Amino acid sequence: MASALEQFVNNVRQLSAQGQMTQLCELINKSGELLAKNLSHLDTVLGALDIQEHSLGVLAVLFVKFSMPNIPDFETLFSQVQLFISTCNGEHIRYATDTFAGLCHQLTNALVERKQPLRGISILKQAIDKMQMNTNQLTSVHADLCQLCLLAKCFKPAVPFLELDMMDICKENGAYDAKHFLCYYYYGGMIYTGLKNFERALYFFEQAITTPAMAVSHIMLEAYKKYILVSLILHGKVQQLPKYTSQIVGRFIKPLSNAYHELAQIYATNNPAELRALVNKHSETFTRDNNTGLVKQCLSSLYKKNIQRLTKTFLTLSLQDMASRVQLSGPQEAEKYVLHMIEDGEIYASINQKDGMVCFHDNPEKYNNPAMLHKIDQEMLKCIELDEKLKSMDQEITVNPQFVQKSMGTQEDDVGSKTSSYS
């Protein structure tokens, strides 16, 4: 091993033993070029370091190995990274979250290129646990995990992370990028869409769209298109975005989504034939955007919406009559829709198989059973917790030096303008 590398190993050991993590971070940041020049000796360096005791030194070496243009032995490197992430010292890693996250991004990109996304899911779950100060902290690796779950069509591993409300962002020594935030909410929305949890999907797409922005983001544009489609499936209309949404959404993103706005306008007419015609007209656009599946679900939801409208007019109706009123192909398709809607709790009805009549019923829920009361209690507890969290965050902002300085500056400007008006 070259003398410079020996010095690197000795410094890593010494600083780790002394607990001087800040100085060790400075060392590994400066050693990238040295390590890159000695690629053939890096496995020897890894052998001289202990993963648990010298986590930052091992991290620096693995990061450089993964940065190589052509990785000669990917399987060996993959095993080294897998072992490192599972056994490294989390307290040490939090001093170099930027490099640690960078290693996770490199791993993700390599697995995506090799079309092996499933292999990285459990590794990234461990990486997130190592990085986080608490479970409600968002890291850039969350977006990587969601991307791999989407590509592997294995959604469930990401759900426990998506279900947690994020209260904080891991700054990663200034390396955290807005792209990671947008990707997390965009990919998360896609995962919830795949799981048919449209309410949560809509929330995630809304977070991506309403992120403060000064320029058009392609991620925000794609999230906006899916937001329109999921809105129609869930509510039968496009939900209005909050007032704090950036002006670029109305100025630039909406004009780039004309096909989706047309679809929403036709959807509002409750006419399936017109909607099918529009879907055929813009089929290339929907296919290019990978939204064909969602568009088909929009068409299906319009049939369901029209069936729900019939429940407000009729007490009983034949399947044949329902099919003609809703523009379905026949009584068999009408029966299929009604059965699915009964199963999903979207309507309350029964079908008489003898005469093919559908009887519509009132909602049987009386809101007076123990399970419902327990659910109400749980919802009230959530509201109380949210109120406490908002008070805590408000207090943090009130004593934040930057906020106080800005507030004082604004007050001085107001006093100055009043004084000048009196003079």
Swiss-Prot record:
Assembly: Component of the CSN complex, probably composed of cops1, cops2, cops3, cops4, cops5, cops6, cops7, cops8 and cops9.
Family classification: Belongs to the CSN3 family.
Classification via InterPro entries: COP9_N (IPR055089), CSN3 (IPR050756), CSN3_C (IPR048621), PCI_dom (IPR000717), WH_DNA-bd_sf (IPR036390)
Subcellular location per the Swiss-Prot or TrEMBL entry: Cytoplasm; Nucleus
GO terms for biological process, alphabetical: ubiquitin-dependent protein catabolic process
Function per UniProt: Component of the COP9 signalosome complex (CSN), a complex involved in various cellular and developmental processes. The CSN complex is an essential regulator of the ubiquitin (Ubl) conjugation pathway by mediating the deneddylation of the cullin subunits of E3 ligase complexes, leading to modify the Ubl ligase activity.
PCI domain mapped to chain residues: 197-365
Organism of derivation: Danio rerio
S-S pairs: none
Database matches in SUPFAM superfamilies: Winged helix' DNA-binding domain
Keyword Nucleus: yes
Alphabetical list of Pfam families matching this protein: COP9_hel_rpt, CSN3-like_C, PCI
GO CC field: COP9 signalosome; cytoplasm
Protein name: COP9 signalosome complex subunit 3
Region (Disordered): 402-423
